[in-house]
Amino acid sequence: MDKNSEEYISKKRAINLWDSGEIDDFEIGSVKGLLDIHYALFHDLDGFDAGKIRKVNISKGNFRFANSMYLGPALEAIEQMPEDDFDQIIDKYVEMNVAHPFIEGNGRATRIWLDLILKKNLGKCIDWQIVDKVDYLEFMKISPVRSKYIKMLLKEALTDKIDDREVFTKGLDQSYIYEGLDEYKAEDIDSQVDK
């Protein structure tokens, strides 16, 4: 087990955030909260510029994320979006995905951010382990113009098991699978002596 790999280190940090209860200390639904989550997961890792808003333009495939020149105002507007019901929360999540405020690690940090918003406002979270990778990535890709599909997919995966560690750790594994990272399972990291 390569304990120096980005996947191992950041997954272990996420597990430690859960186990220590620090995951509940982040400012929920805010840009600051997302920056803090990103920093907690990825600080000291190459290529992340952890916890800092990107200053360069980025794209994935044919999709260009928000222009870095307008990222500040865009993030302020996203932060002000309402979070009163499921649809509003997912709309906010979709907009944050379009903004893609970081150079790397957006998806993993933002999925934790989303779950914290859902937990606070609805007493629910997403059981990510049952959200199919292909469907999720495809529906996120079209979500800026047609969010109903990602809403349907995520609504089917809602659970009230917000304090269930296994839902969190298996969801963490799935979150990394979406990013093509599946060398380490959370349960294997968890069993390591050097906690």
Where are these regions (language model features)?
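FIC/Doc superfamily catalytic core
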Residues: 1-195
